[in-house]
Amino acid sequence: MTEHESLGLEQNQDGGDTYRHHNLSDGCISSVEDANEQPSSYEEESDDDMQYYERAIQEISSGDSYVCMICTVEMDYTCQMFACKRCYRVFDYGCIREWALKSTEKTVDRIWKCPNCYYVSKRVPVKNRPTCWCGKVVNPDPNPLDPNSCGQTCNASTCMHGCSKICHLGPHPECTRMVEIMCHCGKHSKSIFCYQSKVMKKNFNCQEVCGLPLSCSIHTCKKKCHPGLCGPCPEMIISKDSPKKQIKCYCGNHTRANIKCSETKFPKSGKSSKDENGNRWIGVFACADNRVVDYSCRKHSFIESCISPPTINGEKACPFLPSSLKTCPCGRTALEELTKPRKHCDDPIPTCDSRCGKPLKCGKHSCPFTCHDKACMEPCLQIDSVKCACEQSTFSVPCGFQGRPRCNIKCESLMSCRRHRCTDRCCSGRPSAIRRKKNLFRTQDLLDESLVEAKHICLKPCNLTLSCGIHKCQRKCHPGKCPPCLESDSNDLVCPCGNTVVPAPVRCGTKLPTCNHPCIKVVRGESTCGHKPMPHTCHSLDVSCPPCTETVFKPCKCGKKTKVRTVCFQTDVSCGIKCGIPLSYCYHTCQKTCHLPGNCQKVCKQTCGQKRLNCNHECPKPCHGKTECPDLPCATLVKIYCKCGRIKKSVTCGAKSDRVSVTESSVLDCNEECEALKRLKELKEAFGIKEETNNFTSNELDALKKLVSVATTFEELQLPFTEAALSVYSKQERWCSQIEAILNKLMDDKTRSSLHFKPMRPPQRHFIRELAKAYGLYSESQDREPMRSVFIKKEDNGASNKPVLSLAEAYPLYESFKQLQKERKAQEFQARTTAKLINFEVQDTEPKVEVAKKNGFLVQNLVAGNTAEDLRRFFEPHLKHTLVVNPQYLILDDGKTALVYPENYETASVNTERDMELLVGHFDFMAKEAFLADSISLCSTEEELERRLDTPVIQEDSPVMDNNT
């Protein structure tokens, strides 16, 4: 036995780290190695025959070889220890307690298992209460000779004597004390070892006849020495040939030749039986016949079973005699009141008109018939209100109805598995299910099948796939998760390269750990394409090796290029060139990129583009094959000019089969400006002055200046720019001029149709979009903050043009307009102002002003936590426009009342009081809405200060804050 047997493990002979589990359940170790690896000589095998638990004590005593399975730390005699009750594996006390606590928290049954043998236990080791092996001493002293032993006698109650070994680890030894046992019949005894008594006591048989008296007290037991009671007497009682000696029943009508002793029953009354002739006998059994016995009147009779003693004919008085029967059958009325007195027993018995009322056999009702002399109602047909089995409906049924009525309501209660529902109709378990649903709230109780009524225990097979993904759960349908798969394989689980091994037994669902060694195909240099395989780690066989990424040349799909650089595994090689093959059904070519021959596009999605017959414009309709273009008016925008070319206008072409283009048929008329421009041009040519590129004439500028003087709104100025753009230009002239130059450059570039600005702040983006309106450009903001930017694009209809004025030219006009607007408003305000001059005499004495009676605000039930600063923020915005000069804010000592009053509250006038009266209701409503105080009212500041403060003088350290703080 090796050093690792104390752990329940066996180490490989080469000193590796692979261990195999040993079976410790029967106290011995069975190795899973082959028999050839066992020691061949007796000396090697008996070198150390010490048990594994004794070896564990020796290793713990040395302190350098016994390892705790949980923390993997070497244990010595100073450690606090805990041993499994089944396998006696020793663990560190703190480790096993933490193991048990975590396990019980995760299981419904609050159990934990030994890490070595999986022994199930519910008792968690108590904190800081480790004991010795026998459990007598808590926190035993360190013992280097016998670790964790208290040195006292074990005295475990394995037998009547107790274990005599010193406190020890492992199973208790067999008790060798001598005890005396008796045989089953108690006649003989013998002495044996105590440990043999449990088996020998059951098997000790003297083989002699028992001889104990039986229950009849006549015969004795003839069985051989046996355990338990002797049983009923098996002896047979045989009658003699004489008729007087035959065995009779109680009534004497039947006899037997023999009978078992145990079947005889003497009458409890102790009286002998007697017939009409005076013959007597003792009956010992009851026959199955019934006798008809006559009453003393010999007119009536009754039926009697076999009893002891039997009734003799004619001896029993007739119950129908007039002397015996005094009332009607129901017993409510005397016969004397109903009819003449009866003289004989066979005279009819009169009945009354009362209800019978005798209790019926059902025990719940009484007979409903009128007084009668025959049997009462049987079965009982009176109607009862009875609930059905599920207690959801009530039915009216006869009392004698066999079985409970049933409704047609489906149960639909959850079964014990909490997956299926009960499909029975009128289920008797539904009331219990409803009560269970109301009472159970914890998940632990909901999963407890013992709390579910028997009717709703699901007996279907679970049949769910286990965690291994292969096998099915064999349990009946159950709540919660299925148990782990317990199937295992006796073969080692080996990776393809053979370097990573999971030794047998391999539990079902176990996956190979990641193998960091190279793949076997990389080692061998195998690949399907012939290139060197890509370096990669070992993987399972169901995962293919990574594709080859060696650079190669392959022909493309369309065949235009025979050498396209690509990787080896790529089969779909494309040159990226458009096909360009003319399509058979239209005038266009295939626009698909490199594709296989014959896979050209089936539907052409291009614009027709053919030249129209009546103008040079292209057909804008979608491709319509080789059919003629539709004869519709051309919708292309064209420009028509006057003769001198100054005036232009954008119109649709309108060319058609019966109509020429508008450019050929329409010419705009020149106006006076055209003539003036023509003369100006001739003068400039005569004087040698070069032509300036300014589209605005001096007359138009003069007209704009005149318009500024008469315009009343910005729209009447007819400037190309918006007011927002000109306002920004007035503040950021340089930056706005740069943006204007960028847009002018875009308009001059005929090859470019759009522009994307870099990300900017919102005000800058807004200016660009406002400026784009003057150019007739489409604009939009794109992306999210903070990368949001502006995108502008020329309109397709030719509406995008440079404005006739620049920002620099338009801004002076806008500035003049703003100045004129200010002057007009000042004049209008002065015109609406009326001055009234009144002459009055100046008095030498100053007028008397009435002093206010209420000169402050009283804040009551101030919410805790508010300060004078909070009061100032609440009142100041509303008081600064009133006559309340420099308001003061004072919170009184109780903390629930505050005063707000003007600094000159002693001389405040009634005008100040009027202002405060106008605001007090407003303050009261706002204080309640803001949860500042319960109410605000007017008060006399002098009276409140005198009544609430110790002195009327405001102290310097009081919480007062003026309006200028």
UniProtKB/Swiss-Prot annotation:
Q: Which sequence ranges form a coiled-coil region, renumbered to this chain?
A: none
Please state every residue range assigned to the domain named R3H. Answer: 733-796
This protein's source sits in the domain of life called Eukaryota
Pfam family membership, one: R3H
What are the UniProt keywords, alphabetically?
Cytoplasm, Metal-binding, Nucleus, Phosphoprotein, Repeat, Transcription, Transcription regulation, Zinc, Zinc-finger
Q: Where in the cell is it found?
A: Cytoplasm; Nucleus
Q: Where are the zinc fingers (RING-type)?
A: 68-118
Zinc-finger in keyword set: yes
List modified residues, type Phosphoserine. S958
Q: Which PROSITE patterns match?
A: R3H, ZF_RING_2
Give the GO terms filed under biological process for this record. Answer: negative regulation of transcription by RNA polymerase II; nonfunctional rRNA decay
Q: Which SMART domains match?
A: R3H (SM00393), ZnF_NFX (SM00438)
Q: What is its main location?
A: cytoplasm
Which positions does the record annotate as the modified residue Phosphothreonine?
Answer: T951
Enumerate the GO terms in the molecular function aspect. Answer: DNA-binding transcription factor activity, RNA polymerase II-specific; RNA polymerase II transcription regulatory region sequence-specific DNA binding; zinc ion binding
Zinc fingers classed as NF-X1-type: ranges: 159-177, 216-235, 362-382, 468-487, 586-606
Q: Name one GO cellular component term.
A: cytoplasm
Described function: May play a role in transcription regulation.
Further comment found in the protein's record: Present with 589 molecules/cell in log phase SD medium.
* Family note: Belongs to the NFX1 family.
The record's note on quaternary structure and interaction partners says:
Interacts with FPR1.
Protein name (database record): FKBP12-associated protein 1
Task: Give the source species.
Answer: Saccharomyces cerevisiae (strain ATCC 204508 / S288c) (Baker's yeast)
For this protein's source organism, the top of the classification is: Eukaryota, Fungi, Dikarya, Ascomycota, Saccharomycotina
Tell me the gene name.
Answer: FAP1
